[in-house]
Amino acid sequence: MVHLKLETLRLNDEDQSTGSSLITPSRTQLCDEVVRWWKEEPAAEDMLIDTLYEHLIRRRSNWSVTKDELYQALKSHKLYTPELNELDSYTGDIRPSTVTDADIAQLNKKLLDKVTIADTEFGKGLVATDDIRKGGLVFHEQLPLTVIPQLDKQPLVSRGKCCGLCSAFTTLSSQLIIKNNLDCNMCNTIWCSKQCKKLDTTHSVLKHATSRNSLCNSSNWIKFENFCLQESLVAAYAVGVIYARHVMQPTSNLWKLFTSLCSVSQRVRWQASDSINVGGTFDASCNGKLYADVSAPNMETQWSDAFEMFAKSFPKCDMDYEDFLNLTGTFNLNQIMGQVYPLVAHINHSCEPNVRYELEPKHGIKLYARKDIKKGEQLRLTYVNPLHGVTLRRRELRVNYGFLCHCPRCCQEWEKRQKIVSDPSNHAISSEAAHSSTTARRKSSMKSCRPSLKELLENGDEFDLEIPSDVNSKRRMSVRFNSHVTLAVEEE
């Protein structure tokens, strides 16, 4: 006869500290915890400081912190700001794009069948040159400016587990690889297709120490690549790949297009993201890695070291350190999922977008209309998760792109939030009432602009699924997780 014994285990991502000792968190730790919570539960962003404090103490019962300390920490990092003018942006530091229709036409004239690059109130943007019906294809960029391999998969690439260019996991048999000449004769690198091998024009000069190309030192490149991997310097690595392709194909317009895109120094972005402390939670260039213990001077040293290795990799490069910082900023401002698509890069942001994109398995990107677009209307994408509240959206936009969004949705949500925060009578609202009220307002404001689940899945971006607010208590408990999990263990 089989008996079942219930065992309760601790989740391996839980804080394993035990005992009654309390921890005094730093301001950075406080802010990072709140930001992570907001990303998990976007409705919590609109909670009043009293309610926010109550929930934080429940989440981190081993933390010793007062409500005022929490408030001051959030305020110092512009996360709980009563006045919009207290939020700094670096729009004035961004050099606008100088790319023209003629530059894009050199890549593919068909890209401009329905759109044109034009000056708008927000700088260069894409404007429809014809009416576009909802769901219609606007354009299709078949390739990015140059395909940039995924940095975090390079160890697998070196062992022949991933494609040397697109970084896709390979399932090809040895016979098929040899038959189609998809392997490298000098190392373990393989490619998943003939197209990827053809596009990987820099493999031999970057990866083989026997290369005699005077423009690139492969031994130093490998050191540079490993350093970028260790420190998660994705943008620096991307600039290196783009420059290497330019060196190998100097007659192409690759470098001209890349350096003509809008640009800002990476140093400016550090400052906007609070020296990569709490801002690291938002900073897309951090690749999800938080730098809670990295100060601005240390970041400067880190990037200076990266540039020194970059310069040694390309002995004849006349680029200086400031140029390098500007180019890494260029990549961060214009990239989508680690690739640079020069036409898509000109689409400005709105929290109520009228277009969406689909990434293709093999490098391409397609742009579709989310609603009817009239001739002369500007195309708009959302740069951030549209399910988040106005504070989180604006914070993420400020850190990554240097501006504060003033679209109708942001203005309406901000105005409502400020009325609640500034009214002393609202601080007496209970936790549940405040949570329900802010959730209802958020759902109402997003009703017309929320993307469908199909769109979110197609775009491949991170998104949040909300817990329904109208379920009974039994149902709610069935979907709520805590720090433990109970398993049924079979016993004989």
From Swiss-Prot:
It holds the Pfam family SET. Transmembrane segments: none annotated. It catalyses: L-lysyl-[histone] + S-adenosyl-L-methionine = N(6)-methyl-L-lysyl-[histone] + S-adenosyl-L-homocysteine + H(+). Residues 425-448 are annotated as: Disordered. It is an enzyme of class 2 (transferase). Keywords: Chromosome, Cytoplasm, Methyltransferase, Nucleus, S-adenosyl-L-methionine, Transferase. The keyword Methyltransferase applies. PROSITE patterns: SET (PS50280). Histone methyltransferase that monomethylates 'Lys-5', 'Lys-8' and 'Lys-12' of histone H4 (H4K5me1, H4K8me1 and H4K12me1, respectively), thereby controlling gene expression and remodeling chromatin structures. This is Histone-lysine N-methyltransferase SET5. It comes from Kluyveromyces lactis (strain ATCC 8585 / CBS 2359 / DSM 70799 / NBRC 1267 / NRRL Y-1140 / WM37) (Yeast). The lineage of its organism: Eukaryota, Fungi, Dikarya, Ascomycota, Saccharomycotina.
